């Protein structure tokens, strides 16, 4: 007895038929061969009756009705760049959620070490990752058209039996001479999801494709953290550089043996990666359903469970300068006790090279500031440094006193301090925090962007 399913497209839906047949019920034509020593009979199958166990007509809405993403996400054309552990899981989840227009970029083939923590199977070994993911998507979504999947990256064998990568894509040749080609290649996509973990790739996309919504997913060693960085909060490359530098990672113990994309590569099992990746996709879906790209978020495993540390963005009044600070950093600031002189603590962080983006990574109490700064300065390899003061205002909300102003001016003029434009964070009587930047001889207020 043999069973199989047959799907036939019918009026916008797929008519699924569950069929079975029995070999003994077939009609055969016997062909005789005289081999001198004995006769050999071969039976040629002429017909085989198929019996139906059931027929069900399912359209696309019914097929994905139990678990589809919002329509506002599903209609987007997604450019998925990087198909390793993270990227393959993203592709798998997008396919199960009804995303049907997708471009795929990668230059690797599937190797044995990839299987344990990705969407690939043993049947994909030796194939290009792009080809394998395209096949997986088609196997999940019967409504997808071949033209809806754009494959960028394949491996072929030449006449000398050498494996050669075939691509005209920007992926395998990241440089700024081909920016125009890259923009053309990404033309028509509504959302770029970068899963490469590559600084070069994110830098390239952040500048070459800044007019397209960008989500960059990057996982740390042991999958303790997943950074989901979006260009809703500014330049993704600068954001990831700052907030990845804040995380104290295990930079010594990487996986060295076996086959995989990189050697060394990070430790992390399938469950840990999938949990964080799907949390990020869940947040992305909910925000897109509300017609907005999600704020950058750092998902971390902690003693409290999984923490979603969301980045808030402020804009400086009258200037093209933005400020980023995470919710966990603001919680830390709330826990710092008031001081009689109003001098509560200090702000650490990073200025982008063009000076248009300021990223706060720490707000710490004055007593422990020196030791903490020494530690984070070393952890970030000099990227994170002092950038401002944190003070308590006994005055009206959203204001500062003369003493706070004088201290900030003194810091700006102190050549031993590595900033001419220090921040002032003021804790208001209700516990909220207002941020100011010293610029052109005055303290200018930042306004929160929704």
Task: Show the residue positions of the predicted features.
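Conserved beta-strand-loop surface patch within small alpha/beta domains used
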Residues: 311-385, 394-450
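Glycine/serine-rich phosphate-binding loop and adjoining beta1-alpha1 elements at the start
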Residues: 1-76, 434
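Glycine-rich phosphate-binding loop and adjoining beta1-alpha1-beta2 segment
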Residues: 107-145
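Phosphate-binding loop/pocket of nucleotide- and phosphate-handling active sites
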Residues: 40-60, 291-328, 333
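E1/E1-like adenylate-forming module used to activate ubiquitin-like modifiers
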Residues: 1-28, 32, 172-175, 190-288, ...
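Structural motif
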Residues: 77, 190-191, 213, 385-388
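A structured beta-alpha segment of the ubiquitous adenosine-cofactor-binding alpha/beta core
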Residues: 134-189, 196-199
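Glycine-rich adenosine-cofactor-binding loop
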Residues: 68-109
């Amino acid at each position: 007895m043999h069973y199989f399913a047959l799907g036939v497209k019918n009026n916008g839906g797929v008519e699924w038929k569950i069929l079975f047949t029995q070999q003994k019920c077939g009609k055969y034509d016997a062909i005789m061969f005289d081999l001198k020593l004995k006769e050999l009979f071969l039976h040629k199958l002429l017909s085989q009756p198929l019996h139906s166990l059931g027929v069900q007509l399912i359209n696309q809405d019914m097929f994905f009705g139990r678990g589809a993403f919002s329509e506002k996400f599903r209609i987007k054309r997604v450019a998925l760049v990087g198909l390793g552990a993270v990227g393959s899981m993203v592709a798998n989840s997008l396919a199960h959620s009804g995303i049907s227009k997708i471009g795929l970029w990668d230059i690797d083939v599937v190797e044995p070490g990839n299987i344990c923590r990705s969407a690939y199977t043993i049947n994909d070994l030796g194939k290009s990752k792009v080809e394998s993911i395209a096949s997986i998507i088609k196997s999940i979504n019967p409504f997808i058209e071949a033209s809806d999947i754009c494959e960028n990256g394949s491996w072929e064998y030449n006449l000398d039996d050498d494996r050669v990568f075939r691509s005209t894509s920007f992926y395998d040749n990241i440089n700024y001479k081909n920016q125009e080609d890259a923009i053309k290649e990404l033309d028509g996509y509504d959302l770029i999801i970068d899963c490469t973990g590559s600084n070069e790739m994110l830098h390239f996309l952040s500048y070459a494709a800044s007019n397209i919504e960008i989500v960059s997913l990057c996982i740390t060693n042991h999958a303790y953290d997943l950074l989901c960085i979006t260009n809703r909060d500014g330049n993704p490359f600068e954001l990831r550089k700052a907030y990845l530098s804040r995380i104290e990672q295990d930079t010594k113990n990487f996986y060295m043996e076996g086959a995989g994309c990189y050697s060394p590569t990070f430790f992390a099992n399938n469950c840990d990666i999938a949990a964080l990746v799907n949390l990020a996709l869940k947040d992305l879906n909910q925000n897109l359903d509300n017609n907005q790209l999600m704020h950058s978020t750092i998902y971390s495993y902690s003693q409290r469970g999984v923490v979603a540390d969301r980045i808030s963005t402020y804009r400086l009044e009258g200037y093209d300068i933005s400020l980023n600070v995470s919710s966990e950093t603001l919680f830390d600031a709330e826990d710092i006790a008031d001081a009689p002189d109003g001098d509560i603590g200090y702000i650490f962080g990073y200025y982008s090279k063009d000076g248009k983006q300021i990223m706060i990574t720490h707000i710490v109490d004055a007593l422990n500031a020196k030791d903490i700064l020494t530690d984070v300065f070393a952890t970030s390899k000099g990227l994170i440094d002092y950038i401002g003061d944190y003070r308590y205002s006994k005055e009206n909300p959203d204001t500062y006193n003369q003493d706070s102003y004088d201290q900030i001016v003194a810091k700006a003029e102190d050549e031993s301090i590595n900033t001419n434009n220090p921040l002032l964070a003021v804790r208001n009587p209700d516990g909220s925090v207002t941020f100011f930047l010293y610029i052109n001889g005055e303290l200018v207020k930042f306004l929160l962007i929704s």
